[in-house]
Amino acid sequence: MYGAVLPGLFFIFISCVVASSNDVKDGGADRGAHSDRGGMWFGPRIGKRSLRMATEDNRQAFFKLLEAADALKYYYDQLPYEMQADEPEARVTKKVIFTPKLGRSLSYEDKMFDNVEFTPRLGRRLADDTPATPADQEMYRPDPEQIDSRTKYFSPRLGRTMNFSPRLGRELAYEMLPSKVRVVRSTNKTQST
């Protein structure tokens, strides 16, 4: 007999304690500067709602969501199950017509510089022996002995060339090095493969 009544009484007791603690807390906040906090008043919390109002609002929102979901399910069930396709005559397809840019042909990549005239930058002058067009550049070729391949990788200042050597002031004489390569074994007990 006590087994069925005891949980009910316990629930009623807990709900009374929670309700009375909310009333005490709300009443103490109205005292302001005369509270137990020693003259400091932080004011009411902005945006804080009471527990009772929040549950009622949540309950109403939950019921509205359930009604909306039920209405969606009702209308969804009314739809036919097969897919509806558009008529092919009603579709409009966009045709892409290729037109090349003015002054360019389809084989533009093959002839990059046919008749390109060189216009120097402002403030620069062309030397008399410098080629003016790419056709003249093919005729003007410096001697391969004059071209040092190392100047491509190292140039001290733009427009100047320098014979770069590994150590300044020294030139390597390759004639003095032996033509055959000498193989030396290591002192470790490793075996060569």
Curated annotation (Swiss-Prot):
Q: Which family does it belong to?
A: Belongs to the pyrokinin family.
Region entry Disordered: which residue ranges? Answer: 124-158
- Which of UniProt's keywords are assigned here? Amidation, Cleavage on pair of basic residues, Hormone, Neuropeptide, Pheromone response, Secreted, Signal
Its main localization is secreted
Signal peptide residues on this chain, from the entry's feature table:
1-19
Q: What name does the UniProt record give this protein?
A: PBAN-type neuropeptides
Q: Which residues carry this modification: Isoleucine amide?
A: 46
Q: Which residues form the propeptide?
A: 186-193
